[in-house]
Every structure is written in structure tokens, then in C-alpha cells.
Regions:
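Short acidic-aromatic low-complexity motifs
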Residues: 15-19, 141-168
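Short, solvent-exposed secondary-structure boundary/capping segments
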Residues: 70-77
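A beta-strand edge to alpha-helix "cap/lid" segment located at domain peripheries
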Residues: 81-133, 195-259
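Hydrophobic ligand-binding cavity/cleft-lining segments
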Residues: 1-40, 142, 148
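A solvent-exposed, acidic/Ser-Thr-rich amphipathic alpha-helical stretch
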Residues: 18, 37-52, 59-61, 67, ...
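Residue-level recognition of conserved beta-strand positions in structured domain cores
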Residues: 53, 76, 106-108, 177, ...
Length: 259
């Protein structure tokens, strides 16, 4: 490998722990999810790296370094030899914990500035795909978390309701809607309990499928009276943390238009 004087540098935050993120660099099935069918990686020093892009374009590489949950380094080049042959550039992926989950730092070193510049958009796109693929796995159970949120609002026993919210939400969870300005589990649970005292028997339920992108979930809902009549509908936006618990929720009710 010759001199690599030109660097492409990019950092992104992923809604997952470093251990989870690193699996997508060590498991070929996960590797192929964000690179494409047929792609594979052998996550040990000297292991082979294969990326199969659309149109049959193949990238080949060799793993140079592996530090579990922290760092992986591999060579990168095109099987055809153009624009760069195998072994002629180097990719370093570093992971570190952050508030969102994991900060991924990519450094791709090239022998020529023009080749580096040609890869800027490719990595911008590929890391965007990566963030979504990882979060799809992390938040695969988001529907049960959201359903648990709606169900907790109907629990009249204080201790049971506290436990239900604690199971699905962070201690410092925030909730905002037209009738709520709440911070923390205790505030949230007390507010939900009060809603049952003033509107006994009212229940919330999810309507339809969730929509999800990188830890942000949209859920439509319906509020029903004790006799089963539908009273109101709306949409909640949930922000989930790297452990798939609710960090914040914002509710939008479909209120009648003012006359």
C-alpha cells in the first residue's frame, strides 16, 4: 500500500449501543443488510471483506485490525482495479458511546484526492442506510412499547401504573400534548392516574401500524369511553433511546376546528 495522503472523514450518531453497532461489522448477514445481498465480512485480522454493489460492482478488502465494540480497520478497493485496486485504500471505523447511543467515526484514506472526492456521497448515503438498518433491529419491538404506553393510561392502581410506565420509559421521560407538560416518571404516572379519576374508564389504543425512522416512532391512536364509544383520535410522536425505552412523547389530538 502506497502513501494515503487524502482522507474522507465523517461522523454519525447511531441509536444503539456500541456492542450492537459493532455486530454489523462482524456478522455477514447484518453486513449484507446495509451493503447488499452477497456481501460478507470475516471479522478477524487477515479476514476477507466483500461488498457487492448494485450492477455487479464488487469491492474487495482485508481486515487489518479488530477491537471488539471499538474499532475495525480494513483495506478497500475495486475488483476491476478502477478507480482504485484492492489494497490501495484503508477504512477505519471507530465507535464510542454518546448520549444518543454510539458515535461512529469513519476515516477512509486514499492515494488520490479525486478518488476521495468521488466517495464522499457514497459514504454519506451508505452511513444513512446503516443508521436505519441498525435502528430497525434495535426498535423491532417498538409496537409493544407503544402499546404499553397507551395501556398504562387506563391502569387505576398507582403501584401497577408506576411499574407499567417504568418498564417502557426512561426515568426522565418527557410528555407534551394540549393537556400535558410533564417531566419524569412520577409526574407522568400521577397525571395518568388523575385522568382516570376525572374520566373513568377512558382507554387509549393504537390504530394501525407504526411508522419508524431511526428511533422516532409515529403512532396513531383512538381514545374510547367506558361504553366503547370512540371519543377522540390523534397521533403521538415517540423518541426512543438506545435501549428501546421512551425518552419523550408528544401527542397531537384531532380536535374539532374552532368556529
Amino acid at each position: 500500500m502506497g502513501p494515503l495522503n487524502y482522507k474522507l472523514d465523517r461522523s454519525v450518531e447511531i441509536q444503539a449501543t456500541p456492542d450492537t453497532v459493532f455486530r454489523f461489522f462482524t456478522d455477514s448477514a447484518r453486513w449484507a443488510k446495509w451493503w447488499g445481498a452477497g456481501s460478507s465480512i470475516e471479522a478477524h485480522v487477515g479476514g476477507k471483506v466483500l461488498i457487492r454493489n448494485p450492477g455487479g460492482i464488487e469491492v474487495l478488502g482485508e481486515v487489518l485490525e479488530v477491537v471488539p465494540a471499538e474499532r475495525i480497520v480494513f483495506t478497500y478497493g475495486f475488483a476491476t482495479g478502477k478507480p482504485i485496486p484492492p489494497g490501495s485504500s484503508r477504512v477505519t471505523i471507530s465507535l464510542e458511546p454518546c448520549e444518543a447511543g454510539t458515535r461512529l467515526h469513519l476515516v477512509h484514506e486514499f492515494p488520490e484526492a479525486a478518488v476521495r472526492d468521488d466517495h464522499v456521497q457514497g459514504w454519506r448515503y451508505q452511513l444513512s442506510v446503516f443508521a436505519n438498518i441498525v435502528s430497525d433491529e434495535v426498535f423491532a419491538g417498538a409496537a409493544s412499547v407503544v402499546d404499553g404506553w397507551f395501556e398504562a393510561w387506563a391502569i387505576t392502581d398507582d403501584r401497577a401504573r408506576n411499574a407499567a410506565f417504568a418498564k417502557i420509559a426512561m426515568t426522565d421521560v418527557r410528555f407534551r400534548d394540549r393537556f400535558s407538560l410533564l417531566d419524569g416518571l412520577a409526574d407522568l404516572s400521577a397525571h395518568a392516574g388523575a385522568s382516570q379519576r376525572f374520566m373513568p374508564g377512558v382507554r387509549l389504543r393504537r390504530k394501525g401500524e407504526l411508522r419508524h425512522c431511526q428511533g422516532v416512532v409515529l403512532a396513531d391512536w383512538i381514545a374510547s369511553a367506558a361504553d366503547g364509544r370512540d371519543l377522540m383520535s390523534g397521533t403521538n410522536i415517540f423518541a426512543l433511546g438506545p435501549e428501546a425505552r421512551i425518552v419523550s412523547a408528544t401527542g397531537f389530538a384531532n380536535l374539532p376546528a374552532a368556529k
